[in-house]
């Protein structure tokens, strides 16, 4: 989805970035006193989590059943795209994501796969990635999981955004990663995430 020349229009209203690091996490009820499996909760909410919504792409709807099931068996990511978002746990078509920590440091190590959109200031459009890099003008640090969870260290900003296509397609905001020097468009709001233990939140 391309929004050429649209980004600059909305850069009039800029938001202040929130930076935070998730290190030395503690979740005593899972895998030892420090390291474990976590959910990411949005600060200031009761039950809003980071997760993903899925939808069937237009190309999948126009092909034969045989081709569809073949692509599904091959686990083709483009068949049923999963978009990174935030929502309450009981939201339809939404699944909270979990992330694991590195045993030696207890720092975030990996997250389940989902597409994450970002504003690309090089091409002036909204682009997508699958946990690889932030944008073409970024420092190209691999491992978007750590970029997202340790935004101060990697000089990135985390925000929820509501471009028109997201509201119409998924009825939920996207979660975007911005470079440190980028101004946030007026349709974006910075957020802070906190790690929570799944069992403490009622997840089994």
Swiss-Prot record:
Residues 1-17 form the signal peptide. InterPro entries: Vel1-like. Keywords: Cytoplasm, Signal, Zinc. It is found in: Cytoplasm, Cytosol. Induction: By zinc depletion. One of its GO terms (cellular component) is cytosol. Belongs to the VEL1 family. This is VEL1-related protein AC977.05c. The lineage of its organism: Eukaryota, Fungi, Dikarya, Ascomycota, Taphrinomycotina.
């Amino acid at each position: 989805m391309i929004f050429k020349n649209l980004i600059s229009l909305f850069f009039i209203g800029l938001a202040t970035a929130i930076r935070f690091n998730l290190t030395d996490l503690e979740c005593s009820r899972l895998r030892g006193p420090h390291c474990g499996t976590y959910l990411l909760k949005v600060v200031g909410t009761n039950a809003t989590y980071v997760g993903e919504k899925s939808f069937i792409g237009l190309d999948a709807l126009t092909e034969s059943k045989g081709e569809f099931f073949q692509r599904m068996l091959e686990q083709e990511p483009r068949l049923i795209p999963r978009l990174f978002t935030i929502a309450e746990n009981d939201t339809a078509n939404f699944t909270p994501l979990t992330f694991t920590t590195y045993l030696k440091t207890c720092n975030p190590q990996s997250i389940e796969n989902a597409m994450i959109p970002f504003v690309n200031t090089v091409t002036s459009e909204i682009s997508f990635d699958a946990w690889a890099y932030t944008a073409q003008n970024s420092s190209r640090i691999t491992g978007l999981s750590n970029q997202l969870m340790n935004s101060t260290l990697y000089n990135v900003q985390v925000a929820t955004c509501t471009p028109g296509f997201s509201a119409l397609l998924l009825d939920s905001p996207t979660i975007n990663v911005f470079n440190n020097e980028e101004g946030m468009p007026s349709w974006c709001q910075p957020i802070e995430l906190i790690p929570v233990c799944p069992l403490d939140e009622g997840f089994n």
